[in-house]
Amino acid sequence: MTKSIRFTKMHGAGNDYIYVNTMAYPIDNPEELSIAWSKPHTGIGSDGLVLIGSSDIADFSMHIYNADGSEAMMCGNASRCIGKYVYEAGLTQKNKVTLETLSGIKELQLKIEREEVTEVTVDMGMPAVGEMALEVEAGGEIYTGTVISMGNPHLVIFVDEMDQVGLASVGPLLECLPLFPDRTNVEFVQVLKPDEVRMRVWERGSGITQACGTGACATAVAGVVRGKTKRKTKVIMDGGPLTIEWDERSGKVFMTGGAVNVFEGFIKV
């Protein structure tokens, strides 16, 4: 027996996911659906599937499934999109929303103009800084990376010229290094100015994506601990910029950016 599920495709800085309100449309096989729906030619096309649900400890819950069906701990871009979704769908009237994720509760501050959410700031919590100058080998090259956790793992590598990075070939090798038994996200970063960097990302479970919110946060933290950037930095990704601030007093990382509704519809399962 088939049923129709309503979905909304949204993106944050080009990082696009399929969003489903599971309070209205329950889903019991998200891994399979994420794989099928993420395919651009035979599905909807996305970086994965995000389920919005109820929560006993926050306003809403978020579960993220990558394009390969694996479940992600956290996604900053998806968090911003959920902030826009729940407000504009009438699920909340608050401009400050709490979101339960696998990496803890996140607070979203919504900027609202004419009943539309134009910008969302996410309290991403405190980062965990691992090895600051880890040498790794991939594809016959030696890279020096900084290990950062934003609730999910990141390897941040600073380079002089972004255009010389073969992300499609080296990304999957670095993702699956034995040093990272659960695999890792990989960011290559070129410093443009003390408060501006360019970043490209290979996401664990999804490959090359237009943007990664937690990756932008990890990039900003790595820039500070490596003495390369200021605490407030614009991170420019293929899908657009995010403003990241690592607050010195609280130790928390704050991410600010937009969220966009692309289209919505029904799909049969």
UniProtKB/Swiss-Prot annotation:
GO terms for biological process: lysine biosynthetic process via diaminopimelate. It catalyses: (2S,6S)-2,6-diaminopimelate = meso-2,6-diaminopimelate. SUPFAM superfamilies: Diaminopimelate epimerase-like (SSF54506). Substrate binds at N15, N66, G76, N77, N152, N185, E203, R204, G213, T214. It comes from the Bacteria. Pathway: Amino-acid biosynthesis; L-lysine biosynthesis via DAP pathway; DL-2,6-diaminopimelate from LL-2,6-diaminopimelate: step 1/1. Keywords: Amino-acid biosynthesis, Cytoplasm, Isomerase, Lysine biosynthesis. GO terms for cellular component: cytosol. It holds the Pfam family DAP_epimerase. The active site is at C75 (proton donor), C212 (proton acceptor). Its EC number is 5.1.1.7. GO terms for molecular function: diaminopimelate epimerase activity. PANTHER family: DIAMINOPIMELATE EPIMERASE (PTHR31689:SF0), DIAMINOPIMELATE EPIMERASE, CHLOROPLASTIC (PTHR31689). Catalyzes the stereoinversion of LL-2,6-diaminopimelate (L,L-DAP) to meso-diaminopimelate (meso-DAP), a precursor of L-lysine and an essential component of the bacterial peptidoglycan. This is Diaminopimelate epimerase. The gene is dapF.
